Regions:
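Metal-ion/cofactor- or nucleotide/acyl-coenzyme-handling active-site neighborhoods
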Residues: 68-72, 119-122
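Conformationally flexible catalytic loops at phosphate/diphosphate-handling active centers
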Residues: 105-200
Length: 203
């Protein structure tokens, strides 16, 4: 199930492997418990979501934001794309930013039209992303990985005073996210000639 897949993603990230997964709708909801752990442990995973309606009084396979909005509080940064070309261009931004900031990302797009649309796109070579990759951040991530050579304790129980301090200590990582995303979007814009920014004003 998706719950098991989320556990596998969490375990894989704990051992220093850069990991991603894809899901939608009810499947995303099953990942929520592990999403809290992944975000709380500052593991740079990425979940790609074709955003869809949730089954309530009936099942619906059409696009909606019910699933991703149910995950706002998990600690994952959220990046939305609105076309097949944007998915191509900005999925890489989600990965690059997650690695550089140690904050996991949820990259989502319309779960009916965009996810199933047959469209010509300009594909970027992986070398573009490779040149933008923060190798020091990858090294730091791998050095924090669980290994028999350097055992550590994780997932302990904390009293409220220590728990609060460790939660607050993560703010510096989250505060860096907007600038890092903007920087990577600017670099992707230079390569593609398509303008990207975290927020665009219309009106």
């Amino acid at each position: 199930s998706e719950a098991g897949a989320a556990g596998s993603v969490h375990g894989s990230l704990q051992t220093g492997a850069l990991t991603t997964t894809f899901t939608a709708s009810q499947g995303l909801l099953l990942k929520i418990p592990n999403m809290y752990k992944i975000a709380g442990e500052l593991l740079p995973g990425v979940i790609h979501v074709s955003a869809r309606s949730l089954a309530a009084q009936a099942l619906s396979i059409f696009g909606d934001h019910q699933d991703v909005m149910a995950c706002r509080q998990t600690g994952f940064a959220m990046l939305a794309t609105s076309s097949v070309q944007e998915v191509m261009d900005l999925a890489g931004v989600a990965h690059l930013a997650a690695i550089k900031t140690s904050v996991p990302f949820m990259h989502f797009f319309d779960g009916f039209r965009t996810s199933h649309e047959i469209q010509k796109v300009e594909v970027m070579d992986y070398e573009v992303f490779d040149k933008l990759l923060d190798r020091d951040a990858v090294r730091n991530f791998r050095e924090r990985a669980l290994t028999f050579e350097h055992p550590v304790t994780r997932g302990s129980a904390q009293n409220d005073d220590v728990y609060f301090q460790t939660r607050e200590a993560q703010n510096k990582f989250y505060n860096e996210v907007p600038a890092v995303v903007a920087d990577y979007m600017a670099k992707i814009s230079e390569v593609t000639g398509r303008n990207y920014a975290p927020f665009v004003y219309y009106g």
